Amino acid sequence: MSKTLTITMLLFVSMAGWMFGADTGSIGGITNMRDFQSRFADRYNPVTDTYSYSSARQGLITGMVNVGSFFGCLISSPTTDRIGKRNSIIGFCVIYLIGVIIQVTAVPSWVQIMVAKIWTGLGIGALSVLAPGYQSEVAPPHIRGTIVVTYQLCVTAGIFIAACINMGTHKLYKTAQWRVSIGINLLWGIITLVGVSFLSESPRYLVSIGKDDEAIQVMCKNAELPPDSDIIQTEYKQIKSDCEAAVEGGPCTWPEIFGKEIRYRTFLGMAIMSFNQLTGCNYYFYYGTQVFKGTGMESPYLASLILDAVNFGCTFGGLFVLEYCGRRVPLIIGGVWQSICFFIYAAVGNRALTRKNGTSNHRAGAVMIVFSCLFIFSFAQTWGPAAYVIVGESYPIRYRSKCAAVATTSNWLWNFLISFFTPFITNSIGFKYGYIFASCNLCASIVTFLFAHESKGLTLEEINELYLSDAKPWMSRPKNLSEMAEAKEVEREETRPKGESARYLEHADSNSDSEDLSSSANNDVHEPVARQDPFNENEVEKSRTRPSQESYTTSSN
């Protein structure tokens, strides 16, 4: 893959994560700005000359973006099937930009802000599925993991930069306080939109619709290799085989992901992604400014900025933690660590923060901030990135898109519930809220220990066999997973009706001459997909009589 294209993917596609992070990191500070409160808050205290929100209005302004994200995540799958990932990313970027414009131009009506948040969420939710998926399909295997993780890195970077912008604008005059913080988000959407416009469609999508020649051209361009390269041919054959397997047995339906074979992993993915929110991370990211204001800090914006900086910096550590420590151990240890941090945070806030005379104990407030940072230190390296990695690795090809969509929507659902109900809960029980998150973190560790297998270093086929085996997650995994996966594939091939082999390209000799491949990609007669069948019985029979060095030809529409 050329350096230019690699940098382009990192900068432009990952910027979709920046858009998500920027919205998350900015809303807490914006709702605390005086001009924003004077226009959209529903309570005013003339004695103290301060504005405040009812719990319902605070929760709706903050949380409605997650409602939009929930539905955006669901509609991303059928949209991608129709127009491809690249075009879908472009379309949802436009939706996101429209939502931001509506927010910036809001009149003194909090309903407009709420509706704009829903519209913005449609784009953010869809892009949270599409961007990592596009990267994983276009990037070559040896850098695929690094490129995909940059999405999460950009999420944390967006949160941090949004906190910096809030820090710089909260003292500005009138509407500039919050319009600048919201309006700057247009930049991230425009960067993503322009960058993706110059990228190619995913080779996997092109093969799935029969445009094999175009897919090969994209792979050659990305890898800077000729069509006869072993790398190109191997990748093409794998994609072709995957696409065949994906449609084997017909399109996957929603009820099927809760069938006997896959429901264990479906519910596990939903649990892992739910606990990703129930760790309490967005308690800080959404309401950090208000939380630290309640601890007596003179500059709650600064405290929130410090927390977001820790989150951004520690995400780099997550790249190495998941690579060398696997998935299970970081999630288990991270959950226990985070539980301890929240327990201490809640205990100090509940028992030591407020003195008997009603003043704040600044030392207690400092302790709370320290343990908040320690929580983020762990989350950014464990539950932040690892939850998405587990969901991306756990499902067979045929079920992957729908299972991942269900898991991700559970994440957005809990995201909304926490963002909406947090004002109600904190107004009722204050810092005791931390005990709830401490319990959830402990439960997350237990669920991971009991149900999540270690998938580090395994192929997707081996991971599938691991979950189908009788091995317990806390026991040593079977050493013959590769043989089990191969045996299952052979069994599947033997039971396939004659003439429907999906492994013709996969088992054919990979050391092929480039002439046939190139000429086929450029000179084949293009026929509608429905009328062509390069894997029919005659073709397979012909392939057995060809010299071993003959190249593989491709058909396209």
UniProtKB/Swiss-Prot annotation:
Compositionally biased region (Polar residues): 546-557
InterPro entries tied to this protein: MFS_dom, MFS_sugar_transport-like, MFS_Sugar_Transporters, MFS_trans_sf, Sugar/inositol_transpt
PANTHER family, A to Z: HIGH-AFFINITY GLUCONATE TRANSPORTER GHT3-RELATED, PLASTIDIC GLUCOSE TRANSPORTER 4
Annotated segments matching region Disordered: 482-557
Membrane-topology annotation of the record: Multi-pass membrane protein
NCBIfam families: SP
Protein origin, superkingdom: Eukaryota
GO cellular component, one term: plasma membrane of cell tip
GO BP terms: carbohydrate transport; D-glucose import across plasma membrane
Feature: compositional bias, Basic and acidic residues: 485-510
Residues modified by glycosylation: 357
Stretches of the chain found on the membrane's Cytoplasmic side: 1-9, 80-87, 134-144, 201-266, 323-328, 385-404, 454-557
PTM comment: Not glycosylated.
Residue ranges of the TM segments: 10-30, 59-79, 88-108, 113-133, 145-165, 180-200, 267-285, 302-322, 329-349, 364-384, 405-425, 433-453
Main location: membrane
Protein's recorded name: High-affinity glucose transporter ght1
Family under the similarity heading: Belongs to the major facilitator superfamily. Sugar transporter (TC 2.A.1.1) family.
Keyword Oxidoreductase appears in the UniProt entry: no
GO molecular function annotations of the record: carbohydrate:proton symporter activity; high-affinity D-glucose:proton symporter activity
Subcellular localization(s) per the UniProt record: Membrane
Pfam families: Sugar_tr (PF00083)
Extracellular topological domain residue ranges: 31-58, 109-112, 166-179, 286-301, 350-363, 426-432
Biological role: High-affinity glucose transporter.
The encoding gene: ght1
